[in-house]
């Protein structure tokens, strides 16, 4: 929820509500990766997420995911009870991540992304420049996701543990983000479940004429319905109840007999 909940009890209450509203997974992150956000060091990130994970595994009955690109955070999060490592770096941002993923036995989400030169910026998410240049966006994302898949499989991660994420909003222009969303189902030919995270992102705001993040709820629900129509397996959202209901109706309409 973008850091909206700071107190541990508030976080647990929010997570319980999300589960009641229909969430199948709770994703915990200690560093914002939205454009313009500043990198958090490992110790600070651990201090933010480990108490939350330890509490949540006792309080909710769905898997906990750790959203991190740092191997040490991933390792300790799994030790604390996380069952999924959700890496915005696709196991490429930290050289130790593939081994940590393999040894953990956790499910892994490999997101397409391109790492900026951190000697030139203190933000992990590129939104302009050469990192956002592509010929065919789907072909390139497919190829670069395959690199991530090969990395973790070489370390020992098995196919049944891998989930892929096209990385909407990461190292892509608005136009490329929209094209990638339109064609996201083409990535199924890699043979893995797809996680799509577009909730309240800039591309949604752009399609709504430039609306700010507080006015993107309906657009997000439309994107969720589109994801259902494309047989996307996992959708990451902020507003669980509304999106779960929208997805249920969309799925029913597609399969109603």
Question: Which residues does each PLM region occupy?
Answer:
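Active-site metal-binding loops of divalent metal-dependent hydrolases
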Residues: 23, 168, 240
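Catalytic domains of carbohydrate-active enzymes, especially glycoside hydrolases
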Residues: 13-29
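Phosphate/pyrophosphate-binding loops at sites that engage ATP/ADP/AMP, CoA/4′-phosphopantetheine
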Residues: 19-24, 146-161
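Active-site-adjacent loop and "lid" segments of alpha/beta metabolic enzymes
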Residues: 1-14, 33-51, 55-63, 68-71, ...
């Amino acid at each position: 929820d973008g850091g909206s909940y700071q107190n541990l009890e508030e976080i647990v209450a929010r997570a319980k509500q999300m589960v009641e509203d229909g969430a199948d997974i709770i994703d915990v992150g200690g560093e914002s990766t939205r454009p313009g956000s500043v990198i958090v060091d490992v110790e600070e990130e651990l201090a933010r997420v480990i108490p939350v994970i330890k509490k949540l595994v006792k309080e909710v009955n769905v898997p906990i995911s750790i959203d991190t690109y740092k191997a040490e955070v991933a390792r300790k999060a799994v030790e604390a009870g996380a069952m999924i490592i959700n890496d915005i770096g696709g196991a490429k941002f930290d050289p130790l991540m593939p081994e940590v993923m393999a040894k953990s036995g956790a499910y892994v989400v490999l997101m397409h992304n391109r790492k900026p030169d951190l000697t030139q910026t203190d933000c992990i998410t590129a939104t302009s420049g050469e990192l956002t240049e592509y010929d065919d966006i789907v072909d390139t994302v497919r190829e670069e996701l395959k690199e991530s898949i090969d990395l973790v499989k070489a370390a020992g991660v098995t196919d049944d543990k891998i989930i892929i994420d096209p990385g909407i909003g990461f190292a892509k222009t608005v136009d490329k983000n929209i094209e990638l969303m339109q064609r996201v189902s083409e990535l199924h030919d890699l043979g893995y479940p797809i996680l799509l995270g577009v909730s309240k992102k800039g591309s949604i705001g752009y399609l709504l004429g430039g609306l700010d993040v507080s006015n993107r709820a309906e657009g997000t629900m439309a994107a969720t319905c589109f994801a259902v129509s494309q047989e996307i397996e996992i959708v990451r959202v902020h507003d669980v109840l509304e999106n779960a209901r929208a997805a249920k109706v969309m799925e029913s309409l597609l399969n109603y007999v």
